Amino acid sequence: MANYFKAAVKPKTSNQRLTVTVDKLDMNGVGVARWQNKPIFIAGVLPDEIVDVKVIEQKSKYARAKLISIDKQSASRVIPQCQHFGLCGGCDLQMLALEEQLLFKQQKITDLFSRSFSTQNITPEINTAHLPWQAAIKSSPWHYRRKARIGVQFDKNAQATIGFRQKSTNQLAAIKSCPVLVEPLSAIFPLLKKLLAQLTVKSAIGHIEVIQADISDTSSADKIQKDNQVVVVVRQLKPMNDTDIGLWQLYAQRHCWHVIIDDGNKQLPLADIKGGDSFELSYELTDTSKVYFSSNDFIQINHQVNNAMISQALAWLNILATDNVLDLFCGLGNFSLALAKHAKRVVGVEGMQTMVDKATQNSLVNGLDNCQFYQADLNSHWLLEPWVQGQVFDKVLLDPARAGAEQAVSQIAELKIPCVLYVSCDPATLARDSAILVSKGYKLEKISLMDMFSQTKHVETMILFTHTS
Protein backbone atom coordinates (compact mmCIF):
# COMPACT_ATOMS: atom_id res chain seq x y z
CA MET A 1 0.00 0.00 0.00
CA ALA A 2 1.40 3.38 -0.95
CA ASN A 3 2.13 5.88 1.81
CA TYR A 4 1.29 9.52 1.24
CA PHE A 5 2.94 12.29 3.20
CA LYS A 6 1.89 15.88 3.56
CA ALA A 7 4.51 18.55 3.82
CA ALA A 8 4.57 20.23 7.21
CA VAL A 9 2.44 23.33 7.29
CA LYS A 10 4.48 26.40 8.10
CA PRO A 11 3.20 28.29 11.14
CA LYS A 12 1.22 31.39 10.35
CA THR A 13 3.01 34.62 11.10
CA SER A 14 1.57 38.10 11.00
CA ASN A 15 4.48 40.28 12.18
CA GLN A 16 1.73 42.24 13.91
CA ARG A 17 2.91 44.64 16.62
CA LEU A 18 1.03 44.50 19.92
CA THR A 19 1.14 45.99 23.39
CA VAL A 20 0.18 43.44 26.05
CA THR A 21 0.33 42.98 29.81
CA VAL A 22 2.12 39.85 31.04
CA ASP A 23 -0.02 37.77 33.38
CA LYS A 24 2.41 35.11 34.58
CA LEU A 25 5.34 32.85 33.74
CA ASP A 26 4.65 29.35 32.48
CA MET A 27 6.48 26.24 33.74
CA ASN A 28 9.43 27.04 31.45
CA GLY A 29 9.82 30.62 32.61
CA VAL A 30 8.21 32.05 29.46
CA GLY A 31 5.83 35.00 29.88
CA VAL A 32 2.12 34.47 29.18
CA ALA A 33 -0.26 37.25 28.11
CA ARG A 34 -3.72 37.17 26.47
CA TRP A 35 -4.47 38.15 22.89
CA GLN A 36 -7.54 37.36 20.79
CA ASN A 37 -8.89 35.17 23.62
CA LYS A 38 -5.85 32.88 23.59
CA PRO A 39 -2.48 32.80 25.36
CA ILE A 40 0.47 34.47 23.69
CA PHE A 41 3.92 33.33 24.84
CA ILE A 42 6.81 35.81 25.08
CA ALA A 43 10.33 34.93 26.23
CA GLY A 44 12.29 37.34 28.41
CA VAL A 45 9.38 39.11 30.11
CA LEU A 46 8.06 39.10 33.68
CA PRO A 47 4.60 39.20 35.29
CA ASP A 48 2.86 42.60 35.36
CA GLU A 49 5.15 44.07 32.72
CA ILE A 50 3.59 46.01 29.83
CA VAL A 51 5.51 45.11 26.70
CA ASP A 52 5.59 45.79 22.97
CA VAL A 53 5.92 42.57 20.98
CA LYS A 54 5.85 41.26 17.42
CA VAL A 55 3.78 38.16 16.66
CA ILE A 56 6.04 35.49 15.12
CA GLU A 57 3.74 32.45 15.17
CA GLN A 58 -0.02 31.92 15.24
CA LYS A 59 -1.86 28.71 16.06
CA SER A 60 -5.54 28.10 16.64
CA LYS A 61 -5.08 27.85 20.42
CA TYR A 62 -2.02 30.00 21.10
CA ALA A 63 0.48 32.44 19.61
CA ARG A 64 4.13 33.31 20.11
CA ALA A 65 5.69 36.75 20.03
CA LYS A 66 9.12 38.35 20.20
CA LEU A 67 9.84 41.06 22.74
CA ILE A 68 10.49 44.46 21.15
CA SER A 69 10.52 46.78 24.16
CA ILE A 70 9.32 47.08 27.74
CA ASP A 71 6.98 49.99 28.51
CA LYS A 72 6.58 49.17 32.20
CA GLN A 73 9.20 47.08 34.00
CA SER A 74 8.65 44.68 36.87
CA ALA A 75 10.31 45.58 40.17
CA SER A 76 11.79 42.07 40.06
CA ARG A 77 13.71 42.71 36.84
CA VAL A 78 17.51 42.80 37.03
CA ILE A 79 20.18 43.30 34.38
CA PRO A 80 21.41 39.94 32.99
CA GLN A 81 25.12 39.41 33.62
CA CYS A 82 25.76 37.41 30.45
CA GLN A 83 26.28 39.18 27.13
CA HIS A 84 24.77 36.16 25.36
CA PHE A 85 21.55 35.96 27.40
CA GLY A 86 18.50 35.77 25.15
CA LEU A 87 20.40 34.09 22.33
CA CYS A 88 22.10 31.22 24.17
CA GLY A 89 19.64 28.55 25.28
CA GLY A 90 21.48 27.73 28.51
CA CYS A 91 19.84 30.23 30.88
CA ASP A 92 16.18 31.22 31.15
CA LEU A 93 15.87 33.54 34.15
CA GLN A 94 18.85 35.90 34.30
CA MET A 95 16.46 38.88 34.06
CA LEU A 96 14.71 37.80 37.29
CA ALA A 97 16.06 38.60 40.78
CA LEU A 98 17.47 35.52 42.51
CA GLU A 99 14.92 35.35 45.35
CA GLU A 100 12.14 35.67 42.78
CA GLN A 101 13.68 32.80 40.81
CA LEU A 102 13.38 30.63 43.92
CA LEU A 103 9.76 31.69 44.45
CA PHE A 104 9.00 30.89 40.80
CA LYS A 105 10.50 27.41 41.21
CA GLN A 106 8.68 26.83 44.49
CA GLN A 107 5.37 27.85 42.90
CA LYS A 108 6.10 25.54 39.97
CA ILE A 109 6.38 22.60 42.38
CA THR A 110 3.27 23.67 44.28
CA ASP A 111 1.23 23.85 41.07
CA LEU A 112 2.42 20.43 39.89
CA PHE A 113 1.66 18.86 43.27
CA SER A 114 -1.81 20.39 43.29
CA ARG A 115 -2.48 19.07 39.79
CA SER A 116 -1.10 15.59 40.50
CA PHE A 117 -2.86 15.12 43.83
CA SER A 118 -6.22 16.39 42.54
CA THR A 119 -6.24 14.32 39.33
CA GLN A 120 -5.35 11.14 41.21
CA ASN A 121 -7.91 11.77 43.99
CA ILE A 122 -5.32 11.06 46.67
CA THR A 123 -6.56 10.06 50.10
CA PRO A 124 -5.67 11.37 52.62
CA GLU A 125 -5.73 14.84 51.15
CA ILE A 126 -2.88 17.25 51.83
CA ASN A 127 -2.92 21.00 51.51
CA THR A 128 -0.62 21.42 48.53
CA ALA A 129 -0.89 25.20 48.85
CA HIS A 130 0.89 24.97 52.21
CA LEU A 131 3.60 22.37 51.76
CA PRO A 132 6.11 22.15 54.67
CA TRP A 133 8.79 24.21 52.93
CA GLN A 134 12.23 24.44 54.50
CA ALA A 135 15.02 26.87 53.63
CA ALA A 136 16.36 26.44 50.10
CA ILE A 137 19.85 25.09 49.49
CA LYS A 138 21.76 27.72 47.53
CA SER A 139 25.23 28.48 46.25
CA SER A 140 26.69 31.46 44.47
CA PRO A 141 24.32 32.22 41.56
CA TRP A 142 27.34 32.65 39.26
CA HIS A 143 30.40 30.55 38.44
CA TYR A 144 28.95 27.39 39.98
CA ARG A 145 28.89 24.89 37.11
CA ARG A 146 31.88 22.52 36.99
CA LYS A 147 31.00 20.51 33.88
CA ALA A 148 29.58 21.46 30.47
CA ARG A 149 29.42 20.23 26.88
CA ILE A 150 30.48 22.80 24.29
CA GLY A 151 29.16 22.48 20.75
CA VAL A 152 31.45 22.85 17.73
CA GLN A 153 30.30 23.77 14.22
CA PHE A 154 32.39 24.65 11.16
CA ASP A 155 31.07 26.68 8.24
CA LYS A 156 31.95 26.13 4.57
CA ASN A 157 35.06 28.25 5.05
CA ALA A 158 36.21 26.01 7.93
CA GLN A 159 35.57 28.80 10.45
CA ALA A 160 34.58 27.46 13.85
CA THR A 161 31.64 28.46 16.00
CA ILE A 162 31.91 27.17 19.56
CA GLY A 163 29.29 27.58 22.24
CA PHE A 164 25.87 26.39 23.34
CA ARG A 165 22.68 25.84 21.38
CA GLN A 166 20.44 28.78 20.72
CA LYS A 167 16.89 28.65 22.04
CA SER A 168 14.58 26.40 19.96
CA THR A 169 17.18 25.64 17.29
CA ASN A 170 20.15 23.40 16.54
CA GLN A 171 22.31 26.39 15.67
CA LEU A 172 25.06 27.37 18.08
CA ALA A 173 25.35 30.70 19.82
CA ALA A 174 28.99 31.79 19.57
CA ILE A 175 30.09 32.14 23.19
CA LYS A 176 32.99 34.29 24.38
CA SER A 177 32.57 33.56 28.09
CA CYS A 178 29.95 31.95 30.34
CA PRO A 179 29.31 33.39 33.82
CA VAL A 180 27.65 30.25 35.19
CA LEU A 181 30.74 28.10 34.54
CA VAL A 182 33.38 28.00 37.27
CA GLU A 183 36.08 30.61 36.68
CA PRO A 184 38.71 28.41 34.98
CA LEU A 185 36.13 27.08 32.50
CA SER A 186 34.31 30.37 31.93
CA ALA A 187 37.19 31.91 30.00
CA ILE A 188 38.18 28.86 27.94
CA PHE A 189 36.15 29.69 24.81
CA PRO A 190 38.61 32.09 23.07
CA LEU A 191 41.45 29.63 23.68
CA LEU A 192 39.49 26.76 22.17
CA LYS A 193 38.49 28.87 19.18
CA LYS A 194 42.13 29.79 18.53
CA LEU A 195 43.18 26.13 18.81
CA LEU A 196 40.43 24.87 16.49
CA ALA A 197 41.48 27.35 13.81
CA GLN A 198 44.91 25.69 13.71
CA LEU A 199 43.75 22.06 13.40
CA THR A 200 44.65 20.30 10.16
CA VAL A 201 41.51 18.09 10.26
CA LYS A 202 38.62 20.21 11.48
CA SER A 203 35.70 17.95 10.55
CA ALA A 204 36.90 15.27 12.97
CA ILE A 205 35.64 17.04 16.11
CA GLY A 206 32.13 16.28 17.37
CA HIS A 207 32.06 18.36 20.55
CA ILE A 208 34.23 19.36 23.49
CA GLU A 209 33.45 18.77 27.15
CA VAL A 210 35.07 20.80 29.92
CA ILE A 211 35.26 19.69 33.56
CA GLN A 212 36.78 21.04 36.75
CA ALA A 213 38.04 18.14 38.85
CA ASP A 214 40.76 17.02 41.21
CA ILE A 215 43.51 15.16 39.37
CA SER A 216 45.56 12.23 40.70
CA ASP A 217 48.76 11.33 38.85
CA THR A 218 48.47 7.55 38.42
CA SER A 219 51.97 7.26 36.98
CA SER A 220 53.55 8.07 40.35
CA ALA A 221 53.63 5.70 43.32
CA ASP A 222 52.19 8.26 45.75
CA LYS A 223 49.42 9.47 43.38
CA ILE A 224 50.21 13.18 43.62
CA GLN A 225 46.93 15.13 43.61
CA LYS A 226 46.17 18.56 42.18
CA ASP A 227 42.85 20.18 43.08
CA ASN A 228 40.44 22.08 40.81
CA GLN A 229 42.15 21.30 37.52
CA VAL A 230 40.78 21.92 34.01
CA VAL A 231 39.93 18.78 32.05
CA VAL A 232 39.17 19.04 28.32
CA VAL A 233 37.49 16.05 26.64
CA VAL A 234 37.68 16.08 22.84
CA ARG A 235 35.09 13.94 21.03
CA GLN A 236 36.83 12.71 17.89
CA LEU A 237 34.78 11.34 14.98
CA LYS A 238 38.00 10.25 13.21
CA PRO A 239 41.44 9.28 14.54
CA MET A 240 43.53 12.34 15.36
CA ASN A 241 46.74 12.77 13.37
CA ASP A 242 50.13 13.47 14.95
CA THR A 243 50.09 17.16 14.03
CA ASP A 244 46.78 17.78 15.78
CA ILE A 245 47.79 15.65 18.76
CA GLY A 246 50.86 17.84 19.08
CA LEU A 247 48.71 20.97 18.94
CA TRP A 248 46.45 19.76 21.74
CA GLN A 249 49.54 18.80 23.73
CA LEU A 250 51.00 22.29 23.26
CA TYR A 251 47.83 23.99 24.53
CA ALA A 252 47.57 21.52 27.41
CA GLN A 253 51.09 22.38 28.55
CA ARG A 254 50.64 26.12 28.03
CA HIS A 255 47.30 26.40 29.86
CA CYS A 256 47.60 23.52 32.37
CA TRP A 257 44.81 21.49 30.76
CA HIS A 258 44.41 17.74 31.16
CA VAL A 259 43.22 16.54 27.76
CA ILE A 260 41.24 13.35 27.13
CA ILE A 261 40.53 11.99 23.64
CA ASP A 262 37.12 10.29 23.26
CA ASP A 263 36.75 8.18 20.10
CA GLY A 264 33.23 7.00 20.94
CA ASN A 265 34.42 3.65 22.29
CA LYS A 266 36.98 4.60 24.89
CA GLN A 267 38.42 7.68 26.54
CA LEU A 268 42.18 8.01 26.77
CA PRO A 269 44.21 10.79 28.35
CA LEU A 270 46.35 12.49 25.74
CA ALA A 271 49.34 11.43 27.83
CA ASP A 272 48.50 7.75 27.21
CA ILE A 273 48.55 8.38 23.47
CA LYS A 274 51.57 10.65 23.29
CA GLY A 275 53.49 9.47 26.34
CA GLY A 276 53.52 11.18 29.72
CA ASP A 277 51.73 11.20 33.05
CA SER A 278 48.32 9.53 33.19
CA PHE A 279 45.66 10.67 35.65
CA GLU A 280 42.34 9.97 37.40
CA LEU A 281 39.47 12.38 38.06
CA SER A 282 37.77 12.86 41.43
CA TYR A 283 35.94 15.34 43.63
CA GLU A 284 35.86 15.66 47.40
CA LEU A 285 32.85 15.63 49.70
CA THR A 286 32.56 17.72 52.85
CA ASP A 287 33.52 14.72 55.00
CA THR A 288 36.74 14.36 52.90
CA SER A 289 35.50 11.27 51.06
CA LYS A 290 36.88 11.09 47.51
CA VAL A 291 34.54 10.20 44.65
CA TYR A 292 36.46 8.97 41.59
CA PHE A 293 34.75 9.21 38.21
CA SER A 294 35.33 9.06 34.47
CA SER A 295 34.80 12.08 32.25
CA ASN A 296 31.63 10.56 30.75
CA ASP A 297 30.05 9.73 34.13
CA PHE A 298 27.19 11.71 35.60
CA ILE A 299 28.21 13.96 38.50
CA GLN A 300 26.32 16.76 40.22
CA ILE A 301 27.54 19.88 38.44
CA ASN A 302 27.25 22.29 41.41
CA HIS A 303 29.92 21.29 43.94
CA GLN A 304 28.69 23.59 46.72
CA VAL A 305 25.04 22.57 46.42
CA ASN A 306 26.02 18.90 46.19
CA ASN A 307 27.84 19.02 49.53
CA ALA A 308 25.02 20.97 51.19
CA MET A 309 22.50 18.50 49.74
CA ILE A 310 24.36 15.53 51.23
CA SER A 311 24.61 17.25 54.62
CA GLN A 312 20.87 17.99 54.62
CA ALA A 313 20.05 14.41 53.60
CA LEU A 314 22.03 13.10 56.58
CA ALA A 315 20.33 15.57 58.92
CA TRP A 316 16.80 14.89 57.69
CA LEU A 317 17.25 11.11 57.75
CA ASN A 318 18.89 11.32 61.20
CA ILE A 319 21.12 8.35 60.44
CA LEU A 320 21.83 6.18 63.48
CA ALA A 321 24.68 3.73 64.02
CA THR A 322 22.10 0.92 64.03
CA ASP A 323 20.46 1.86 60.71
CA ASN A 324 20.34 -0.29 57.59
CA VAL A 325 19.98 2.15 54.69
CA LEU A 326 18.95 1.51 51.08
CA ASP A 327 20.34 3.91 48.45
CA LEU A 328 18.49 3.56 45.13
CA PHE A 329 19.85 5.04 41.89
CA CYS A 330 23.12 5.39 43.80
CA GLY A 331 25.39 6.21 40.85
CA LEU A 332 29.03 6.52 41.87
CA GLY A 333 28.13 6.49 45.57
CA ASN A 334 27.66 10.25 45.96
CA PHE A 335 25.25 9.70 48.89
CA SER A 336 26.27 6.14 49.81
CA LEU A 337 29.76 7.06 51.00
CA ALA A 338 28.44 9.72 53.37
CA LEU A 339 25.64 7.47 54.62
CA ALA A 340 28.07 4.63 55.31
CA LYS A 341 30.12 6.79 57.69
CA HIS A 342 27.09 7.02 60.01
CA ALA A 343 24.96 3.90 59.38
CA LYS A 344 25.46 0.26 60.27
CA ARG A 345 25.12 -0.84 56.63
CA VAL A 346 24.36 0.74 53.26
CA VAL A 347 23.06 -1.13 50.22
CA GLY A 348 23.44 0.86 47.00
CA VAL A 349 21.59 -0.13 43.82
CA GLU A 350 22.19 1.20 40.31
CA GLY A 351 21.03 0.20 36.83
CA MET A 352 24.44 0.13 35.13
CA GLN A 353 27.04 -2.45 36.13
CA THR A 354 29.89 -0.08 35.27
CA MET A 355 28.56 2.40 37.84
CA VAL A 356 28.15 -0.38 40.40
CA ASP A 357 31.81 -1.31 39.89
CA LYS A 358 32.90 2.31 40.31
CA ALA A 359 30.78 2.79 43.44
CA THR A 360 32.29 -0.37 44.91
CA GLN A 361 35.78 0.90 44.15
CA ASN A 362 34.96 4.29 45.69
CA SER A 363 33.86 2.62 48.92
CA LEU A 364 37.10 0.61 49.05
CA VAL A 365 39.29 3.64 48.34
CA ASN A 366 37.58 5.45 51.22
CA GLY A 367 38.06 2.54 53.60
CA LEU A 368 34.37 1.71 53.97
CA ASP A 369 33.56 -1.95 54.53
CA ASN A 370 29.85 -1.52 55.34
CA CYS A 371 28.77 -0.69 51.75
CA GLN A 372 27.55 -3.23 49.21
CA PHE A 373 26.51 -2.28 45.70
CA TYR A 374 24.24 -4.19 43.31
CA GLN A 375 22.99 -3.88 39.74
CA ALA A 376 19.24 -3.95 39.12
CA ASP A 377 16.63 -2.41 36.86
CA LEU A 378 14.83 -0.20 39.36
CA ASN A 379 12.09 0.56 36.85
CA SER A 380 10.93 -3.06 37.01
CA HIS A 381 9.87 -5.39 39.83
CA TRP A 382 12.84 -5.88 42.18
CA LEU A 383 11.31 -7.09 45.47
CA LEU A 384 12.56 -10.64 44.82
CA GLU A 385 16.17 -9.55 44.32
CA PRO A 386 18.63 -11.11 46.82
CA TRP A 387 19.64 -7.70 48.19
CA VAL A 388 16.00 -7.23 49.31
CA GLN A 389 15.01 -10.73 50.40
CA GLY A 390 15.32 -11.20 54.16
CA GLN A 391 16.51 -7.62 54.68
CA VAL A 392 14.92 -4.97 56.86
CA PHE A 393 15.72 -1.40 55.89
CA ASP A 394 15.18 1.46 58.32
CA LYS A 395 15.61 4.24 55.78
CA VAL A 396 15.80 4.67 52.02
CA LEU A 397 17.25 7.42 49.86
CA LEU A 398 16.45 7.60 46.16
CA ASP A 399 17.90 9.96 43.56
CA PRO A 400 16.40 8.98 40.19
CA ALA A 401 16.85 10.53 36.76
CA ARG A 402 14.17 12.80 35.28
CA ALA A 403 11.87 9.86 34.53
CA GLY A 404 11.36 9.51 38.26
CA ALA A 405 10.82 6.33 40.26
CA GLU A 406 7.20 5.25 39.82
CA GLN A 407 7.96 1.54 40.12
CA ALA A 408 10.46 2.04 42.92
CA VAL A 409 8.21 4.09 45.22
CA SER A 410 5.39 1.56 44.88
CA GLN A 411 7.74 -1.20 46.02
CA ILE A 412 9.21 0.95 48.80
CA ALA A 413 5.64 1.34 50.06
CA GLU A 414 5.16 -2.45 49.95
CA LEU A 415 8.24 -2.82 52.16
CA LYS A 416 6.86 -0.12 54.49
CA ILE A 417 10.32 1.37 54.97
CA PRO A 418 9.69 3.91 57.76
CA CYS A 419 11.65 6.84 56.33
CA VAL A 420 11.99 7.87 52.66
CA LEU A 421 14.17 10.68 51.33
CA TYR A 422 13.48 11.54 47.68
CA VAL A 423 15.96 13.69 45.74
CA SER A 424 14.44 14.86 42.45
CA CYS A 425 15.61 16.64 39.30
CA ASP A 426 12.13 16.77 37.72
CA PRO A 427 9.19 18.31 39.59
CA ALA A 428 6.52 16.65 37.43
CA THR A 429 7.66 13.09 38.13
CA LEU A 430 8.32 14.05 41.76
CA ALA A 431 4.69 15.17 42.12
CA ARG A 432 3.48 11.91 40.55
CA ASP A 433 5.67 9.73 42.77
CA SER A 434 4.84 11.74 45.91
CA ALA A 435 1.14 11.18 45.28
CA ILE A 436 1.81 7.43 45.17
CA LEU A 437 3.67 7.47 48.49
CA VAL A 438 1.02 9.58 50.23
CA SER A 439 -1.75 7.30 48.91
CA LYS A 440 0.08 4.33 50.44
CA GLY A 441 0.39 5.70 53.94
CA TYR A 442 3.33 8.09 53.88
CA LYS A 443 3.30 11.60 55.31
CA LEU A 444 5.15 14.45 53.59
CA GLU A 445 7.25 15.87 56.44
CA LYS A 446 9.66 18.32 54.78
CA ILE A 447 10.39 19.75 51.36
CA SER A 448 13.09 22.09 50.11
CA LEU A 449 14.39 23.52 46.87
CA MET A 450 17.99 22.89 45.87
CA ASP A 451 19.11 25.62 43.49
CA MET A 452 21.53 23.41 41.58
CA PHE A 453 21.02 25.37 38.33
CA SER A 454 20.70 29.04 39.22
CA GLN A 455 19.53 31.34 36.38
CA THR A 456 17.68 28.46 34.70
CA LYS A 457 14.17 26.99 34.85
CA HIS A 458 15.47 23.65 36.16
CA VAL A 459 14.28 22.60 39.61
CA GLU A 460 15.91 20.18 42.06
CA THR A 461 13.98 19.18 45.17
CA MET A 462 14.41 17.13 48.34
CA ILE A 463 11.43 15.64 50.21
CA LEU A 464 11.27 13.63 53.42
CA PHE A 465 8.43 11.14 53.92
CA THR A 466 7.66 9.04 56.98
CA HIS A 467 5.26 6.11 57.16
CA THR A 468 2.22 6.91 59.26
CA SER A 469 2.33 3.53 61.00
UniProtKB/Swiss-Prot annotation:
Gene3D superfamilies: 2.40.50.1070, Nucleic acid-binding proteins (2.40.50.140), Vaccinia Virus protein VP39 (3.40.50.150). This is 23S rRNA (uracil(1939)-C(5))-methyltransferase RlmD. GO terms for molecular function: 4 iron, 4 sulfur cluster binding; iron ion binding; RNA binding; rRNA (uridine-C5-)-methyltransferase activity. The keyword Transcription regulation does not apply. S-adenosyl-L-methionine binds at residues 300, 329, 334, 350, 377, 399. It comes from Colwellia psychrerythraea (strain 34H / ATCC BAA-681). Residues 11-69 form the TRAM domain. HAMAP family: 23SrRNA_methyltr_RlmD. InterPro entries: 23S_rRNA_MeTrfase_RlmD, MeTrfase_TrmA_AS, NA-bd_OB-fold, SAM-dependent_MTases_sf, TRAM_dom, U5_MeTrfase_fam. Belongs to the class I-like SAM-binding methyltransferase superfamily. RNA M5U methyltransferase family. RlmD subfamily.
